[in-house]
Amino acid sequence: MKEKFLLRNVYNEKMITDLADRIINVYSRFEKSGFIEFVLSDFQDLNFGERALKITSGLEKYLPQDYLEAIDILTKSLGPELSSEPGLTIWEGFYIMPVTDFAARNGLTHFNESMQFLYESTKRFSSESAIRPFILKYPKKSISLLKTWATDKNVHVRRLVSEGTRPRLPLGIRLPIFQKKPEMILELLDLLKDDSELYVRRSVANNLNDISKHNPKVVINILKEWQKEKTKYFAWIANHSLRTLLKKGDKQALSLLGFKNPEMKNCKLTISNSKYRIGDNLEFSLEFISIKKQKLMIDYAIHYVKANGKLSKKVFNFIKM
């Protein structure tokens, strides 16, 4: 039987050895064996985040204590730039994550040098998590710099502008300043909304979806502006950025996509059975008569009992027509 893949195993002895080799190639005094031994001690018992932190701690222990010297070494040790959107199988790039965390943990008092390092590292693997402590500490300064990055020729740098400023990035610290004042990042998203790369536009939509969870009116208003401007990719971005509001049945979000108040009659929902066991298939059908020619989006919700005994639901799209 094929062994189950565990995300934590992207951090393994080979990856750590490769990282040590990259460093020693540009910094001959690096204690390779000591670094590897330190990182691998108790490694098997650690989860994904703990392994990443152990690597970062190893860098802190074995690189020069002078931050600027250390970050220069790490910059020179970076591998070749990615040529396009990274695929799901490029696990080797994960070694850069704890390297960028080194900058986030130790370089907050060196804004320019640290941000330049993150600029270079994101061309190899996203710095979306590591940039966030700098944004929290220097919000205006960071946004000013990110405006210039929004027009960078490198697609990964442009994506970082949007992904790094997401208020609710998964696996990253939240940015409450943008939850309270999302207007601060709208100019950045406006610069990226017509980006030639779907990779970037997807990030713009994800950012707007994050904002919609706290400030739905802000998202509706900016999308209305983009709609008036006849933004090239408006339909795609609107559909993806409004997904949370659409699942809530938000009337303004639905209207923005052309789903007005539906006019239907003789609606009939049929469910195959009244009782089900875990693992059974639930089949249902819906019949109705549309009174006029109109756009319709029909969702359905599955209610389930959570571990704490409370009832919750998950919304799924049934059909758009």
Per-region residue spans from a language model:
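Surface-facing alpha-helical segments and adjacent helix-coil boundary elements at the starts of domains
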Residues: M1-A253, E283-S285, Q294-M297
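Proline/serine/threonine-rich low-complexity linkers at boundaries of modular beta-sandwich domains
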Residues: Q252-N266
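Contiguous segments within soluble domain cores/interaction surfaces
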Residues: I289-M321
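A generic structural signal for short, solvent-exposed coil/turn residues
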Residues: Y95, N261-E263, S290-K292
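Contiguous beta-strand segments within globular domains
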Residues: M264-T270, S274-S290
